[in-house]
Every structure is written in C-alpha cells, then in structure tokens.
Amino acid sequence: NDCYLEFNQEENADNVLLNPSTGFRNGELERGYLQGKKLTLHNDIFKNDALVFFILKSSEITIKSNSNPHELKFSFEGFPQFGIWAPVGAPFVCLEPWAGVCDEAGYNGEFKDRFATVEVEPNHLYLCSYSMEGK
C-alpha cells in the first residue's frame, strides 16, 4: 500500500462495474467509489477488472509513493471517461483516458447508437490530448 494516485480536484465519482470474465459493462455502478483526491493502490483493487469512471473533475492524476520522492504526473484533456487498471499482482498501473467505453453485455444495436460514442459533425474537430511528466 505504498503507492497511491493523487487527483488534482476533489472527486465524487462512481465506478462503472465490469464483468471480469467478459470485459463488458454489467449495468451496475459502485456509487461514490472515488471520494476526495487520493486513491490508495493495493493488491485487490483490480481484482474485479478495471476501475472505470464516466465523469472526473480532475485533469491530472499523479502516481506517488509514501517511501519514494519520485512521481509521475499524467495530464489529460478532452477525454470523457477514464480507466485505471493493472493485471492482478503486477508491479505497475495503467492510466487510460478514454473517448468511449465498452458495451453492456448483450448489446446488439448499431455502432452509432452505442453509449458514450463520440460524434464529430462534418467540418468540426474533436480535440483531446494527454502528457506525462516524471520527477
């Protein structure tokens, strides 16, 4: 429990639950999963698959350690969703800004009608970016 994620804004975000055997959304939310600015990383945090947040106030997440002064700041803009995951027992964590999410199990509709699909009108731009800075 040495490492943690620090968000640059106070959060009150729901975790979108996934079915770990299929990777699909199961239609349920873990309400208020992320509270405040700190999320402690521990061995079981990803046992049920990724943490998926549809709405974050933050535009920066920093990986920090209680025992080491080094840190990695991950900045992002224009991404509506965010995923955080790691294989169980892995010595790393993946921070992924997303523009769209996986379907709920059993979805048979059109691609254009999928939940969280980003639509860009003709002659318009959709801009998003991310950067990383190590210290």
Question: Can you say where each PLM-predicted feature lies in the sequence?
Answer:
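Short alpha-helix capping/helix-loop boundary micro-motifs
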Residues: 111-117
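Glycine-rich active-site loops that engage anionic ligands at enzyme catalytic sites
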Residues: 65-108
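Active-site/ligand-binding surface loops and adjacent short beta/alpha elements
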Residues: 1-76
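Extended aliphatic helical segments
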Residues: 16, 52, 88, 93, ...
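A short, acidic, flexible beta-alpha connecting loop/helix-capping segment that sits on the rim
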Residues: 99-101, 114, 134-135
